[in-house]
Design a protein with these regions (language model features):
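C-terminal-of-GTPase-core extension/linker across diverse P-loop GTPases
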Residues: 31-36, 42, 54, 233-295
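AAA+ P-loop NTPase catalytic core and its hallmark functional loops
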Residues: 109-120, 191, 241
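Canonical P-loop GTPase G-domain recognition
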Residues: 176-177, 185-265
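Membrane-inserting effector segments that mediate pore formation, membrane fusion
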Residues: 286-324, 328-379
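Hydrophobic alpha-helical transmembrane segments of membrane transport and translocation systems
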Residues: 382-414
Length: 414
């Protein structure tokens, strides 16, 4: 991903430097400057520091590791070993498409009775994984267990999982989160209800029973509550196209994973998900962060001289939402959106200069801008950007949302 960063990323970096410089030169209090600087650096990590999520997947042979990778992408990225353990030595693999990638720590199947088709370098699966963990720290550990096997011989696997968690902390001082995943719930009884969303009462009862069992076992071993998500990842492909799709709860898993990941790993996974609800949730979380900054700046009336801080942050927010949507992040798409809101800025102007020009047309611009209006403008822009980039609505529809949200905020001010 880093190699693909071009001029737009340089402009975004310049924009963030411009914002931070304006913060330092502003008449804001020292306390506020420190808080605002921390928020801005956090926001910067979403775009400038964006990288693939690093996910370690642990589970026995046949637990569905490769199927899960394919289900996340909606493409056949990992080979599935039907009879022998397909996974070789524990090492990092980058699975990617045009939207981005995920780094997967590919573990040998725990408890396997056959050698993997990719010959492992050492005999102990957990030792192989430890070698890779030394190289890169996983963002999250996924513990996969088949629905039919949650009560069968997984205690040893759980102890190895705990050891891995402890090793990660010892190596990286990182308390890695664990997510339990019950796989292949479509195969639970009754077999007659094998299609999502599995509404049969007995099916749901069996699914929830497996979740409770795995929750109990994981919590007992790692001594802290662990979220467990039941899924079905079964998909059939022909010539690269999906011809049968039995995926269930993959969107729920992705939504939860994003909340557990570091900021720099969230945007690319949201892009890859292609799930609008996931993309919107992350976009709104980012918008809330920007609103917090604009509200803090406007705790007292904001001098026009300090306004480029607010408008600069709003531009960075728009660019981040565009990136989350899966659109190629470029200056043109940001400028087209700004133009759609009725704000005319020269197309050849650098983003940092755009933030200066936006001050002239900012809602309510006078000698001072109140914090509530600044936050309202940020909120209105974020909702319009979500409509435009994620929902793929027209410029007219996005502008209507922007004006409606802004009018409601103005009415509250009166």
């Amino acid at each position: 991903m880093t190699n693909n960063k071009g001029s737009i990323y340089r402009q975004m970096e310049e924009l963030f430097r411009f914002i931070l410089t304006n913060v330092e030169q502003s008449k804001l209090s020292t306390k506020n400057k420190v808080q605002i600087r921390e928020e801005i650096i956090g926001l910067q990590s979403f775009v400038i520091g964006a990288r693939p999520a690093r996910i370690a997947i642990v589970g026995r042979r046949g637990a569905g590791k490769s199927s899960l990778i394919n289900a996340i992408f909606g493409e056949q990225k990992a080979e599935i070993g039907d009879y022998k353990s397909q996974t070789g030595s524990g090492k990092w693999y980058l699975f990617e498409n045009e939207l981005g990638g995920i780094e997967i720590l590919d573990t040998r199947g725990l408890g396997e009775s056959h050698l993997p088709e990719e010959q492992a370098a050492t005999a102990n699966p957990i030792e192989e994984v430890k070698q890779s963990v030394k190289q890169k720290c996983p963002d999250v550990l996924l513990f996969l267990c088949k629905g039919k096997e949650v009560g069968a011989r997984i205690d040893e696997d759980l102890q190895q999982l705990l050891q891995l968690k402890q090793d990660i902390y010892a190596m990286h001082a990182y308390n890695v989160p664990i997510v339990g995943i019950v796989t292949q719930v479509d195969e639970l009884a009754p077999a007659s209800n094998s299609e999502p969303p599995f509404t049969h009462p007995k099916k749901q009862e069996n699914i929830q029973a497996t979740v409770r069992i795995l929750e109990g076992k994981l919590t007992e071993v790692v001594t802290t509550p662990v979220t467990v998500i039941p899924i079905s990842a079964y998909v059939e492909y022909d010539l690269g196209e999906i011809i049968y799709d039995r995926r269930w709860n993959i969107d729920l898993l992705l939504d939860y994973l994003i909340t557990e990941l570091p900021k720099e790993a969230q945007v690319i996974l949201a892009k890859l998900s292609k799930v609008k609800s996931v993309q919107k949730k992350l976009s709104r979380n980012i918008a809330k962060s920007v609103m917090a900054v604009t509200g803090l700046i406007g705790a007292t009336p904001v001098p026009i001289a300090d306004m480029p801080i607010i408008t600069g942050l709003q531009i960075s927010m728009i660019g981040t939402i565009a990136m989350i949507s899966g659109d190629k992040l470029n200056r043109k798409s940001i400028m087209q959106f700004i133009g759609a809101m009725g704000i005319n800025v020269g197309m050849g102007v650098a983003l940092r200069e755009v933030s200066r020009q936006l001050v002239k047309v900012f809602p309510g611009a006078g000698n001072f801008i109140s914090g509530s209006i600044a936050s309202a403008g940020t909120y209105a822009l974020s909702e319009a950007a979500i409509i435009y980039f994620i929902d793929k609505k027209s410029q007219a529809e996005a502008k209507k949302v922007y004006l409606d949200k802004l009018d409601k905020a103005r009415n509250k001010e009166q």
